[in-house]
């Protein structure tokens, strides 16, 4: 089903299901030998959502015949894990280095099943704000409480759709725009129309004191992405057990790249292509088939002032 301006979702449907997919990939990345990341909450959260395929993915419980077919395509469990492991590491490192430098406000936009407020080690006095749909926030908070998990920073949730007046809601939750902030928009931008992406950046800029930092990704050439290959891989992975069509969820219209917009509005920008990040982390290059679906993802690390 195509996106609309007022669509909504939970963690088992539409855009929300992609948050569950990401958590399943984080769980898989946490299970491989010598993992780059460790998210102990990802698998139980995915199990609680209850999508069969993602539950299997999170536990690494692949059907042998299914896995054999993927191996013929050059896709391995480690290879599937590397993409999310490297992305998660990139954002984890941004939060850790920012707070080590003295930043004490962190904002996670479209937080989904992100558990950084629980699994990272935060300096005393750090407040982590999480923004997402009310159902998503409630589900994650309640499930983690049932697991006996406690945040490792002061965690404040802002249950709001980013199409609403989230800057006002964030400030009502105690956010101080006079203090430097580290922001993340992880895996978010492709789910926004171009004009909404620009509004998001404008709001972040308005709320950011000098020294604030924003990390996100951009996908050059999204308008030419081959979604037919993505659908075929979904069938290969999950058969008929997963109804998730990425093409219907993302906005493929041409847009200004995040790095360019931010550079034009007072941010100092560093970019790193996905292939470069893999090399820096000594990971095998991305599988060519997976790589052919999307052009190279570019990570953006921007500092204001």
Swiss-Prot record:
<dbReference type="Pfam" id="PF04072">
    <property type="entry name" value="LCM"/>
</dbReference>
<comment type="function">
    <text>Exhibits S-adenosyl-L-methionine-dependent methyltransferase activity.</text>
</comment>
<protein>
    <recommendedName>
        <fullName>Putative S-adenosyl-L-methionine-dependent methyltransferase MAB_3787</fullName>
        <ecNumber>2.1.1.-</ecNumber>
    </recommendedName>
</protein>
<dbReference type="InterPro" id="IPR011610">
    <property type="entry name" value="SAM_mthyl_Trfase_ML2640-like"/>
</dbReference>
<comment type="similarity">
    <text>Belongs to the UPF0677 family.</text>
</comment>
<feature type="binding site">
    <location>
        <position position="132"/>
    </location>
    <ligand>
        <name>S-adenosyl-L-methionine</name>
    </ligand>
</feature>
<keyword id="KW-0489">Methyltransferase</keyword>
<dbReference type="GO" id="GO:0032259">
    <property type="term" value="P:methylation"/>
</dbReference>
<keyword id="KW-0808">Transferase</keyword>
<dbReference type="InterPro" id="IPR007213">
    <property type="entry name" value="Ppm1/Ppm2/Tcmp"/>
</dbReference>
<dbReference type="InterPro" id="IPR029063">
    <property type="entry name" value="SAM-dependent_MTases_sf"/>
</dbReference>
<keyword id="KW-0949">S-adenosyl-L-methionine</keyword>
<dbReference type="GO" id="GO:0008168">
    <property type="term" value="F:methyltransferase activity"/>
</dbReference>
<feature type="binding site">
    <location>
        <begin position="161"/>
        <end position="162"/>
    </location>
    <ligand>
        <name>S-adenosyl-L-methionine</name>
    </ligand>
</feature>
């Amino acid at each position: 089903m195509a996106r609309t301006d007022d669509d909504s979702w939970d963690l088992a449907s539409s855009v929300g299901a992609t948050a569950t997919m990401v958590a399943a990939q984080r769980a898989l990345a946490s299970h491989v030998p010598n993992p780059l990341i460790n998210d102990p909450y990802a698998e139980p959260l995915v199990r609680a959502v209850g999508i069969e395929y993602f539950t299997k993915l999170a536990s690494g419980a692949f059907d042998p015949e299914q896995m054999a077919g993927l191996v013929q395509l050059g896709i391995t469990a480690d290879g599937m894990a590397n993409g999310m492991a490297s992305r998660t590491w990139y954002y984890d490192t941004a939060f850790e280095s920012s707070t080590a430098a003295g930043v004490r406000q962190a904002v996670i936009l479209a937080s989904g099943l992100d558990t950084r407020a629980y699994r990272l080690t935060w300096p005393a006095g750090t407040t982590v704000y999480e923004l997402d749909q009310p159902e998503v926030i409630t589900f994650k908070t309640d499930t983690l409480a049932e697991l006996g998990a406690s945040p490792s920073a002061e965690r404040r949730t802002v249950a709001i759709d980013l199409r609403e007046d989230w800057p006002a809601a964030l400030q009502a939750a105690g956010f101080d725009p006079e203090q430097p902030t580290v922001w993340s928009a992880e895996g978010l931008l492709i789910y926004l129309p171009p004009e909404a992406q620009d509004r998001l950046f404008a709001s972040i800029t308005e709320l950011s004191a000098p020294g604030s930092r924003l990390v996100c990704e951009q996908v050059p050439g999204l308008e030419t992405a081959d979604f037919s290959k993505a659908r075929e891989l979904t069938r290969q992975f999950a058969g008929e057990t997963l109804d998730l069509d990425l093409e219907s969820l993302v906005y493929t219209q041409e847009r200004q790249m995040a790095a360019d917009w931010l550079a034009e509005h007072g941010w100092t920008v560093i970019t790193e292509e996905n292939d470069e990040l893999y090399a820096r982390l000594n990971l095998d290059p991305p599988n060519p088939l997976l790589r052919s679906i999307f052009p190279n993802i570019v990570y953006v690390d921007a500092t204001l002032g």
